[in-house]
Swiss-Prot record:
This is Probable extracellular metalloproteinase 3. Its EC number is 3.4.24.-. It comes from Arthroderma benhamiae (strain ATCC MYA-4681 / CBS 112371) (Trichophyton mentagrophytes). Residues 1-18 form the signal peptide. Residues 19-246 form a propeptide. Keywords: Glycoprotein, Hydrolase, Metal-binding, Metalloprotease, Protease, Secreted, Signal, Virulence, Zinc, Zymogen. Its main location: secreted. PANTHER family: EXTRACELLULAR METALLOPROTEINASE MEP.
Length: 633
């Protein structure tokens, strides 16, 4: 077997991408005169942590012979005995031994699309924790399927196109029946990357009522949208979900942060056991190019939607070694190096996340899942030097079974222009959107981080992982990090504050979110808390700066990797569209599941430092902070 020789910036994926708020992905709609922020889903979720759950289930009767799905189903039935619901086909058991089961509430056989229930089952077969956003109001008595007094799906498509000013021509659209109840695919349209779709669903509104809507799906590249169009008035759009997460990154790369920190180095056979087919095969075909089971990387100078026939470097002997110079211009002159770097960073991050539990059953990005669960045929499509934009990057996360798509842009902030692919932090931040969207709410639901606060946490997780991965042996808790400084050509980076444990350097507190209205700003607050948490756990368990964690009984043995594991496990525990308080509780529950709460007080102290302590409360307009610790800490 020939070894894979990659010439790339070596360093643990380091930096995150920073992006000015004015240029995040949804601003593509803003440039069309539409403010997508005003269409975000309302936060409806509740979360019962493991302590509260233990008290609640004492009064419930569960059979020891039940499997974890049956136990979860009984809990939902006992909690909402008058509700109808279905089991979502994406349940799995995580590497921490917790089973995750997801449910969707229904009414008259139709989904209530933002009414979810997630149940987490412990190793002992008992309910560990759960969350839900089920509708508790009165279900409409009349079945809409009887009189069918709702609009045609084509009208809904046209309503979405008009309301959001989408570049989709729908004059000749015709609806063709698709799989699923009241589901359709539209023929005769142009402008979308794939045929638009629609299905009839109910939607919980902000005022607590239900609306019958057409959920219209349109992938227009920079935005991949689910638009909830009123089924009785196609001119009314209630809410919008965008699968694309964007960021104006200014970042860094794996051991190295950016080209200022070192030179390209050749690495042989860098894959881990997470990639049993290597990076250049999917177990069926061996590819002499930057394509494999986890990712397919190519250039995309036109910014188009196709990728299979786009240019990739070819190497029959799998030696991908190409020249690069910091003075080279334009970036297209080193596209082979750029594509190779993007392919390397994406695969390396895939393998790291796999070790933490983002595997096939959890909904990761792979073509061939090897009968290990989940849905395959969904590697990450990663475009280098994408011509659809500049000074930015984005990642679209459809549900498990459909490929994720990353677009990496060139940056015009310096002369010569800079290529975002050379900053691993940008790539890591974007790929983390795929991680969090697949875990939160389950692999089959990619709409669980689309409220303002949960969307902010989506940005914060990207910043956190990019920063955690870039730590160096010389770093201490007094080390500060900026985001996106190299790509932005600005040493201060692109966030409001540096990531720092010093409250004078970074004064963000939980209550700061009360005055913030943009997801990247809110994300900076969340990532600041996670940065504090990481250093608290490093002080408790020591730090290691190896590329991969060392596990003992499933627990990373150093504080840095332990934080990454707990934060990731928390994503799978928390409810759909969580708030800060619920996400904090989910991390505490993740520690209970993994270490029997060995780090409980350390975690509480880290969050309390910035006001997310015991007694902190969520309110969309008036969050209450607390620096207190719970009894026993």
């Amino acid at each position: 077997m020939h070894g894979l020789l990659l010439a790339g910036l070596l360093a643990l994926p380091m930096n995150v991408l920073a992006h000015p708020a004015e240029q995040h992905a949804s601003n593509v709609l803003s440039r069309r005169g539409v403010d997508i922020e005003s269409f975000r889903l309302p936060l409806k979720a509740k979360y019962m942590d493991s302590d509260a759950t233990a008290q609640k289930i004492q009064a419930m009767s569960f059979s020891k012979d039940d499997d974890y799905v049956s136990t979860a189903t009984k809990l939902v039935k006992s909690t909402f005995p008058k509700s109808t619901f279905r089991v979502v086909d994406d349940h799995y058991i995580g590497t921490n031994g917790i089973g995750h089961v997801h449910f969707k509430q229904t009414a008259h056989g139709l989904d209530i699309d933002n009414s979810d229930f997630n149940v987490n089952i412990g190793r002992d077969g008992k309910v560990f924790s759960f969350g839900n956003s089920f509708f508790t109001g009165e279900i409409p008595k009349e079945n809409p399927m009887v009189k069918r007094a709702f609009s045609d799906p084509v009208k809904a498509l046209k309503g979405a196109v008009k309301a959001l000013n989408l570049p989709v021509k729908s004059d000749n659209a015709k609806a063709k029946t698709a799989a699923g109840k009241e589901s359709f695919e539209f023929m005769g349209t142009t402008g979308a990357l794939s045929a638009p779709k629609a299905n009839l669903v109910y939607l919980q509104k902000e005022d607590g009522s239900l609306a019958l809507t057409w959920k219209v799906e349109t992938d227009v590249g920079d935005n991949w949208l689910l638009t909830y169009v009123d089924a009785h008035n196609s001119e009314t759009v209630h809410n919008v979900v965008d699968y694309v997460a964007s960021a104006e990154y200014k970042v860094f790369a794996w051991g190295l942060n950016d080209p200022t920190e070192g030179n390209p180095t050749s690495i042989r056979d860098p894959w881990t056991d997470a990639s049993p087919y290597t990076w250049n095969s999917d177990g069926m075909t061996k590819y002499p190019t930057t394509r494999g089971n986890n990712a397919i990387a190519q250039d995309n100078p036109t910014g188009g939607s196709t990728y299979i026939n786009n240019y990739r470097p070819q190497s029959p002997n799998l030696i991908f070694s190409y020249p690069w110079s910091p003075t080279a211009t334009p970036p297209s002159s080193y596209k082979d190096f750029s594509i190779t770097q993007l392919f390397y960073t994406t695969n390396r991050y895939h393998d790291l996340l796999y070790s933490f539990g983002f595997n096939e059953a959890a909904g990761n990005f792979q073509v061939n899942n090897g009968n290990k669960g989940g849905k395959g045929n969904d590697f990450a499509i990663v475009n280098a030097q994408d011509g659809s934009g500049t000074n930015n990057a984005n990642f679209a996360t459809p549900p498990d079974g459909s490929p994720g798509r990353m677009r990496m842009y060139n940056w015009t902030t310096a002369r010569p222009n800079r290529d975002g692919c050379l900053e691993a932090g940008i790539v890591i931040h974007e790929y983390t959107h795929g991680l969090s969207n697949r875990l939160c709410g389950g692999p089959a639901n990619s709409a669980c981080l689309n409220a303002l606060e949960s969307g902010g946490m989506g940005e914060g997780w990207g910043d956190f992982y990019a920063t955690a991965i870039r730590l160096k042996p010389r770093d201490t808790k007094d080390t500060n990090y900026s985001m996106g400084a190299w790509a932005a050509n600005n040493p201060k980076g692109i966030r409001a504050y540096l990531y720092s444990t010093n409250l004078q350097t970074n004064p963000y507190m939980y209550t700061s979110v009360n005055s913030l209205r943009e997801v990247h700003q809110i994300g900076t607050v969340w990532a600041s808390m996670l940065y504090d948490l990481m250093w608290a756990l490093i002080e408790a368990h020591g730090g290691t700066y190896s590329a991969d964690p060392v596990f003992r009984n499933g627990v990373p043995q150093d504080g840095r990797h332990l934080t990454m594991k707990l934060v990731m496990d928390g994503m799978a525990l928390q409810p759909c569209n969580p708030n800060f308080v619920q996400a904090r509780d989910a991390i505490l529950d993740a520690d209970r599941a993994l270490t029997n709460s060995a780090n409980k007080c350390t975690i509480w102290k880290a969050f309390a430092k910035r006001g997310l302590g015991y007694g902190a409360k969520y309110d969309a307009r008036n969050r209450t902070g607390s620096n207190k610790l719970p009894p026993g800490c």
